[in-house]
Amino acid sequence: MLIDAHCHLDHLSGDEANTFLEHLSEKGLQALIACGTKSEDWEFYQNLSHKFPALKVCYGIHPLEITDNWQKDLDALEKFIPQSVAVGEIGLDFHGIFQQEHIPQMKLQMKVFERQLRLAKKFDRPVVIHCRDAFPILKEILIYSQFPLQRVMFHCFVEDREAAQWIEARGGYVSYSGVLTFKKPGNTVETATQFPLDRIFVETDSPYLAPVPFRGKQNSPEFVHYVAQKLAEIKNISLEACIQITSNNTRKFFGF
């Protein structure tokens, strides 16, 4: 059975999340990696993970969820990380903010990202990275922080061939979402063709980015099947082999 390597459940009520997780195996899923992206959500995920062992949880401050209380949030995060499989999702999102007045916002994202890399090192956790329109700077922060790429997952990977080669050369991991199935998939098909299968994950990023044939609708973790199917076509292997390899990759990276 499949593992959705990256999803969100905080759009659901507690009862809805409980019902969904109770029937996980019926949906063809053996596990989910869910990310709490802001402090208000961490307890929600913590409570769910205590009830459902198949739910593996990451905690982090998403770059677009940084508030004026970011220092308090980092202090709180330190208490949740020991109960997580990774720190995430964290990173940089510079989409649409390249104007002069946005420089303080960009600098704050960089600071909070670097601080969370330090916490991941402190607690010996891998990281799940969100990167949008910021790869050159994010790369420099990873180099400066000396964070090992072997413990980095680039979620919803859409970067170009050059970025993929840089990640591959340093032992990093990438995760493909429903974008891989789109009519206009950007760089994803090219990089998925070339990237080593033993360092690829499949994800939904639900409730966002529903794959074809559900594009435009609310995404759900069971739709990861369509991402795996597309990846199997690209790699010219059976769906069963693709599921086995990507699931093994996910378990190995997150340590379960």
Task: List each language-model region with its residue ranges.
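Mid-domain alpha/beta scaffold segments of enzyme catalytic cores
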Residues: 1-256
